[in-house]
Every structure is written in C-alpha cells, then in structure tokens.
C-alpha cells in the first residue's frame, strides 16, 4: 500500500515520477491543450491519458484524468483510483485533483489506497523484465495541506481503505485455505496485529461451545463439513460510547449449496460467501482504530456449507438460539440460518441498533444489478440513516421493502415455527429479510444484501478491483460515526 501525504506544492514543481493531473474542462488544460487534443482527450468523465511532461512539469510523466466541472467526493475517489491504476513502474506520484475541501482530500486518499490494491498472494514472483516497481508513495497537492483537519482526513482514509483491502484479501483467499477454523484464526490474528492493546476483545466459539449455547442455525449449516463452524465475537467498548451498534456478518467460507447442491458454474465463485463477515470484522477494527465513541459488538457467523452423509437435509428442523424451530427446505438458503443465531445474540447483548451484512440472495442481484446492495429493514428511520451513510461513503445501496405477505409465508411451516425457504420463487430477497426479522425483536435493524457488489468477476474499474471488493466496510464505518455524532 503506498503511503499518502499532503503538500502545498504546485503541480508543475512537485517532485515525483508521475504527475496525476485532474482536468475539469478547457480552462484547466492551459499549456497542455494542444497535447491533450492531439491525444484525443475529449474530457469525458473518467477518461485518462499518459504522456511525457516534456519539461512542462518536474515530474517526467503526466497522467491526465478528466473530471466534471464540480467533482463530488466520489468522482475524485474514482478518478484518483483510475489514474493510480494506470501508473506503471513508478515509485512516486503527485496527485493534483483540485479537492474543494477536506472531504474531497479524504476521498482522493481513499481512492489512491483502494486503487493500488492487488491480490497476488498466489502468483509466483515475476522474473527478469517482468519485475515491476510498486507505487511506494503518493502526495496529494492541495492548499489545505497544512490544516490538521486535512492530515486527520488522510489518516482516516488510510484506516478505512486498509480495512476495505483486508476484507478483499479474505474474500479472495481460496476457500480450501480459509475454512472456518482458519478464518476464525485469521480474524484473531488480524485484531491483535492491528490494534496495540486490547481495545477489541475477540472470543471464538467452536462447535462444542456452539452446541452448549444452542446455536442450532450455525451448527445445522456447518454439519456437512469436515471443518466445523465457528462464531467469532468482537467487542469494542470505549468508555465514552454514546450508543451500542451490533454487526452480524454471514461467514460461509464456501457455499456448495449443501445437499440442495448448486450447479458447477453456480458454485465457482462461492468463496465470496463470507464477504459479510469479512466486512463487519474489518469495519469493527477500523472503528476501534479511529476511536469512535460507539460500542460495537460484531458477530462473524462462520460455517462451510457442504453435502455429506451427515449434512442437514431438506425437511430437517433446527433449534435456533432464540428458542424457535425452523424447518429447512433448501439447504442452499443457508445464510439466513447462520445469521439468525448471530441476530439473536445481538438482541441478547441489548444493542441499540443491529446491521447484518450478507451475500444472501441471487434474487437481490436480479432486482438491483451487480453494483447495488439492497437495504431491508424493520425501521424506516434507521434504514434512512444507513442509506445516508452509504451515500456519504460512496457505496451504492438501495432500499427494498419487506412485503407484507412474506410474514405469513415465513410462518407457514406445517411442522416448525418458521420455514426457511419460500415455496414461491418470487421476491427471494424480501422473503429472506422477513425470515431474519423474526430474530431481531424490537431492535431497529437493517439488513444489507451484498450478493451482487461483493465480488467483481470482470475487469477492474475505478477503485473496484477484480475479485473481492470489500463492499460494506465504508458504509459501516460511516454509520458508526453517524451514530456517534462525530467525523
Ligand atoms: N450465497 C448464495 C447467494 C448468492 C448468489 C451470493 C449469487 C452471491 C451471488 C445463497 O446462499 C444462496 O444460495 N441463495 C439462494 C437462495 C434460494 C435457494 C432461496 C439463491 O439466491 O439462489
Ligand atoms: Zn446458498
Ligand atoms: Zn450462501
């Protein structure tokens, strides 16, 4: 990850290998007008072009990036990332994107760190000519450089973007190398290496403890795997906490579908199914690093969903943590079962608000596309707060209703209190949320269905790499600062 700093230098005098220069329209082109025109740089938002500075600037290479006349923070986050991704073989960049304020400086810093992410843990080291110089440092050029609010914004950006990158790493790890015990251990190691003292406490329940604690949902899903399930709980309890936020994440390290097995292509990306747990853990660590005055209890509900001679069958009934019974009718709808126990624990912990994050349904992807997460909630005000946080963070989310008729359907099991799977194939994301709502009592709760945005199976764009995206982390950190009333 490059280190990011601030400077009041002018773009032409900044010392760096590459100058990234934002162009907001013809006036911004100045002496470069002819060069940019010859390169076919039309100024269409997001466009980039690269050329030697020819002595016009100290930096030997310029990357021009087109900006709108009045770029938003998200425009700048994307532009910074896009430009940084096109840097090849340079160690230092100076970034001149004309931030209008400190929020924009923060967005640029986030874009730099998010855009430089690469997952190469399993790539052999490049040989000879293929060896690349990594970007080591970036300096953002702004007149605000000497203001402490700007320095703080850059520090905050580093914390948040590194948390996003941590979540990406977990999602990208091959599922055979991140089975439930591995994931739990990796979370424990991450917490202790990221925080100095014991600001965040970690507790891990193994399968025996889960049985003692009557977590029948997590156990039922993990039953078919040789690698038994885990529940990892993180607690951050600052003395000045003004509110208690519980986060619950779906942590299916691999979703084969279980006995209701998926098709080959359907399961090929299912290592992503722990992206919700990755997001809540990474966000909790970031919230603690930032010292936000909000108590956070995060539950990573971790299991591997596999078929076997002893896997949970369609027709089986599970005894859940909150005392209710659930008839399983499709073992591929496993996320709601592990989340239900986490949600019940969050209610027991007397949280003021609960947010769960889950790659829950293909239906949500059908409804909102691959880049927008669904927000489903029991409380309109709280849903509004979450939506506002997602906007401020630059993550695309949109509310979906929990349609009235779903309640009766969730209660229509002939043998148990609840049924886990809707006999009708419509509104799958809504039914899943109606099921989860049964476990949150009266606590204001929002469910983020990130099935689409958690993974990018195409080429990298803006700050979104191929593979795990780390979606949810930025919204959760914003939400915590919103609830804490600080920035
Ligand atoms: N993990 C999947 C949901 C998913 C699908 C995530 C595509 C990311 C991309 C989930 O466990 C699942 O299999 N859901 C089923 C539910 C159905 C059986 C009611 C689905 O969406 O098909
Ligand atoms: Zn599934
Ligand atoms: Zn799943």
Label for each model-derived stretch:
Residues 167, 183-487:
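A generic structural signal for tightly packed, nonpolar segments enriched in small/aliphatic residues
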